[in-house]
């Protein structure tokens, strides 16, 4: 019978995910984000305008609503742009890495042996620009699932095939 050992690992010798060159989201995805963003803010703007014109008590504060609306619009646009620039991904031999976050950076490293299945999604606007989103479902539940948006459709299909191949090798 083999004797049990539990040696200390020198963490300085472990590979560093921080040194991996990550791929940013496709530049066309910023256009998709802007269009989706615009749709939401146009709907909100129409609702506020209708409220302003149909209720007399709001006519006095309409200017404040408009100023607040545009400040929120510009701030949201800035936050979305920063968030877009921070998102990046990489696929390595044994895992996938995805980085996001504005104030604090969130980096997910998911080993392929934790992947249960993979889905490819195309939204209406994304499809117009030839982009897709790869969704990776893991054994850890929904909190550890990963969505990588803004990938060219052909590349997303290749990524899905790669991951499906990795899953098949595990079975």
Question: Could you tell me what each predicted segment is?
Answer:
Residues 1-113, 117-171:
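N-terminal basic, Ser/Thr-rich segments that initiate or prime the first beta/alpha elements at protein or domain
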